[in-house]
Amino acid sequence: MISGIWKETVGSYHASYSTYELVQMFKGKVVITPDNRGSSATVESGDMFVFESDFKGSWKIEENVTKYFCFVL
């Protein structure tokens, strides 16, 4: 298991996960769009969610983000 605090400013990037990730949003707002499946989800301060180990998709950070993350290896 690896955990920590991650901060990022407004912008966009593509993400590809090879392990599960637990996320708790402390600050900010992000629109997450999976590649080739499902619809976008907007997450913001107070939300907690899990990325599956095969997730691939884009992050559109609309407000600066501070999140807690925990990768399950």
Q: How would you describe each model-predicted region?
A:
Residues 1-17, 43, 50-54:
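Conserved short histidine dyad/triad with adjacent acidic residue
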Residues 16-45:
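A short beta-strand-loop-beta hairpin characteristic of the jelly-roll/cupin
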Residues 44, 53-73:
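Ligand-binding loop in jelly-roll beta-barrel domains
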Residues 9, 33-37, 62:
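Short strand-coil-strand connectors
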Residues 7, 31, 50, 60, ...:
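Conserved beta-strand segments that form the floor/walls of ligand-binding pockets within enzyme
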